[in-house]
UniProtKB/Swiss-Prot annotation:
The gene is ATG7. Residues 650-689 are annotated as: Homodimerization. This is Ubiquitin-like modifier-activating enzyme ATG7. A motif (GXGXXG motif) lies at residues 370-375. It comes from Gibberella zeae (strain ATCC MYA-4620 / CBS 123657 / FGSC 9075 / NRRL 31084 / PH-1) (Wheat head blight fungus). It is found in: Cytoplasm; Preautophagosomal structure. The C-terminal residues 650 to 689 are required for homodimerization, as well as the interactions with ATG3, ATG8 and ATG12; and the C-terminal 17 residues are required for the ATG8 lipidation. Gene3D superfamilies: NAD(P)-binding Rossmann-like Domain, Ubiquitin-like modifier-activating enzyme ATG7 C-terminal domain, Ubiquitin-like modifier-activating enzyme ATG7 N-terminal domain.
């Protein structure tokens, strides 16, 4: 008694890059959308080892979203059309109606067979589905493959021994199949018709000796209904499929759905099947198997109802269950860190801030002038936002009082005189995250009110600072003294850079962005750190006691100010006008509206002043001052015109900046006005002559 056909099931073989692609797709594009999307599988004839049988490959580029960008498959590999549904939670994975999901996939194959559209996409006969859940935080992927197979009823059985072709027959067949595959769509290559035709092909060279009494002709499946087998003896007719099975006489999984088509469309109950296992490179080895199969007679060859569908894959232990892979075990630690750093940021775009432009923030090159308390906290917050380029400038060394307040340093950094702060801060950032591009420069920023003693050294520091400012997008002023911020303020504004500033008191802080030279129409330009001064900066360290020389603040003030400063920068970067963004005008009791309304992060204030003594914070909008010692047009024009000559004169001549900016003239006018004030007596304060008012 003939036994029913047995089929070798597909086994999934997933390349590691596919997991990375799925990870990126979920994080950057799909987000909360867990609808099914296309995925491409590939299979091919394999070597004779049973463990390599019926491997369905999922390559790194397998995710497809449409025909325009579908990856092409090599000529020797066959397409399998798949879909993947990557759900949002593990509970969704467990609760998915898997039988219904399989039936839906099976119905797609069945409907294509019924309406004939299968002829355009025969690769649908080898279709598959993937249900998956990607744990983006732990880099674990849970998945379950299904290869929907429509059951034949009655079943097909072998009706004779397996046959094999001769070496000459195989060589001729491989040549014809290869030629045919070049002429058809990639989706048709896995299934075809073959027939033996006596004599030589008309296109063959008549002078070439004919080794076979026949030649092969190959046709697409649709050719069956247009007379491909007309006038061909039954024993010379073959239906064929590319067989990934390596078992001697057990065909691969693609034949199962093909048999439904053979009955319903071809209306056959007996046929010869070529399990095509040959390759061009070894076409003389004759590996293909020919099976003669038949099914019990039936009254009606039409199948009225969709056949039963099975196909959920078994795990390596033979059980019907999902599989899991821990991608973290295979990923390079540096690459793992890259993905993890951006995870929380990209999750913001899923629901909370879909308009957030993370690339703008990531690509902003930041120069931090000062690698102390503010510099440490600012750099960590910048890294939290995904900024990759952070450069430190500081002339100091790590002292024993630093590590408890400055989180980039530790006790060992204080030994042997202390490591240079800027260089050690850059190293610390790389220890935290190797993917950051961080460097440190030990140079002294020339300060107003501090005449130089070594012109060559001071000029070199100035030129190095100028180069660094030109190379970066955002300049952070995080130094200890007021006068050290003056030159970077001038240089940053002259270069058109974003300048961010934070300054601390014992229990207060100011966080601000310096105004740009240009401003939106109808808006007054915003001021800088020095716009409220009535005198030019001078040496603030002279004749000060130790408690005045050190930055004596409540320990929580620096982290608060640093965080606000970085948040202010990111809000500024999200504004369509960038550094030229206007600031809202504070109104008592009124919360300003977002400008523009779709701004991803909200307001972009000019200044934020906070007081920890009262735990209050206020937002201020300050106008630029045309006599400002740092950002007034006279100062900027002089700097642009003379560069180092201007800086040299400002450092050496005490009153130069005040005279040039106009502050000195303002002071003189104020003194003149005070001298001409006519102080009149108030009659209410004059006594009646009986005594003196003390």
């Amino acid at each position: 008694m003939a036994k029913p056909l047995q089929f070798a099931p597909f086994i999934s073989e997933i390349e590691l890059p596919f997991y990375s692609a799925l990870f990126a797709s979920k994080l950057d594009h799909d987000k909360l959308d867990d609808s099914a999307r296309s995925v491409l599988g590939l299979y091919e004839p394999r070597s004779e080892e049973p463990e390599s049988s019926c491997r369905l490959q999922i390559l790194g580029n397998a995710l497809t979203s449409g025909k325009t960008n579908e990856p092409s498959s090599p000529l020797a590999t066959m397409r399998a059309e798949g879909i993947i549904r990557n759900v949002n939670t593990l509970e969704d994975f467990k609760n998915t109606d898997k039988p219904a999901m399989l039936r839906t996939a099976g119905r797609q194959v069945w409907d294509a067979i019924k309406d004939g559209s299968i002829y355009s996409v025969p690769s649908l006969l080898s279709s598959f589905i993937i249900l998956s859940y990607a744990d983006l935080k732990k880099y674990k992927f849970t998945y379950w493959f299904a290869f929907p197979a429509l059951h034949s009823d009655p079943v097909w059985k072998r009706s004779g021994p397996a046959e094999r072709l001769t070496s000459q027959e195989t060589t001729a067949l491989v040549d014809r199949v290869g030629t045919w595959r070049y002429s058809v769509d990639a989706r048709e290559r896995g299934f075809f018709l073959a027939k033996k035709v006596p004599g030589r092909r008309e296109t063959d060279d008549p002078d070439t000796p004919q080794e076979l009494p026949f030649h092969w002709e190959i046709g697409s499946l649709r050719d069956f209904e247009t007379g491909f087998f007309d006038q061909v003896p039954e024993e010379d007719r073959y239906v064929a499929f590319t067989d990934p099975s390596t078992y001697p006489e057990a065909p691969g999984w693609p034949l199962r759905n093909f048999l439904i088509l053979i009955r319903h469309r071809f209306r056959l109950t007996k046929t010869k099947v070529i399990c095509y296992r040959d390759t061009w490179a070894k076409r003389h080895e004759a590996k293909s198997v020919i099976l003669t199969i038949e099914m019990d007679p039936v009254e009606n060859l039409d199948i009225t109802e969709m056949p039963k569908v099975t196909g959920w894959a078994r795990s390596s232990n033979g059980k019907l269950q999902a599989q899991q892979v821990n991608l973290g075990e295979y990923m390079d630690p540096a690459r793992l860190a890259d993905s993890s750093v951006d995870l929380n940021l990209k999750l913001m775009k899923w629901r909370i801030a879909p308009n957030l432009n993370l690339e703008t923030i990531k690509n902003t090159k930041c120069l931090l002038l000062g690698a102390g308390t503010l510099g440490s906290y600012v750099s960590r917050n910048l890294m939290g936002w995904g900024v990759r380029k952070i450069t430190f400038v500081d002339y100091g060394r790590v002292s024993f009082s630093n590590p408890v307040r400055q989180p980039l340093f530790n006790f060992n950094d204080c030994l042997e005189g202390g490591k240079p702060k800027a260089l050690r801060a850059a190293e610390a950032l790389k220890e935290i995250y190797p993917g950051v591009d961080s460097e440190g420069h030990a140079l002294s920023v020339p300060m107003l009110g501090h005449p130089f003693t070594d012109e060559t050294k001071t000029k070199e520091d100035y030129q190095k600072l100028e180069k660094l400012i030109n190379e970066h997008d955002a300049i952070f002023l995080l130094m200890d003294s007021r006068e050290s911020r003056w030159l970077p303020t001038v240089m940053g504004k002259a270069a058109g850079k974003i300048v961010m500033n934070a300054a601390l008191g014992f229990d207060s802080y100011v966080v601000m962005r310096h105004g740009a030279e240009t401003s939106p129409e109808g808006q007054t330009p915003l001021g800088c750190y020095f716009c409220n001064d009535v005198v030019a900066p001078a040496d603030s360290q002279k004749d000060q006691t130790l408690d005045q020389q050190c930055t004596v603040t409540r320990p929580g003030v620096a982290p608060i100010a640093s965080a606000l400063l970085v948040e202010l920068l990111t809000s500024l970067l999200q504004h369509p006008l960038g550094k030229d963004a206007p600031a809202p005008q504070p109104t008592s009791g009124v919360i300003p509206e977002r400008d523009p309304p779709d701004h991803a992060l909200g307001l972009v204030p000019h200044q934020i002043r906070g007081y920890t003594s009262t735990f209050q914070q206020i937002v201020i909008r300050g106008q630029s001052y045309d006599c400002c010692s740092a950002c007034s047009p006279k100062i900027l024009n002089a700097y642009r015109h003379d560069g180092w000559g201007f800086v040299k004169r400002a450092l050496q001549e005490k009153e130069y900046v005040a005279e040039l900016s106009g502050l000195a003239e303002v002071q003189r006018r104020a003194e003149e006005m005070a001298a001409h004030v006519d102080w009149e007596e108030d009659d209410d304060l004059v006594d009646d002559g009986e005594g003196e008012l003390i």
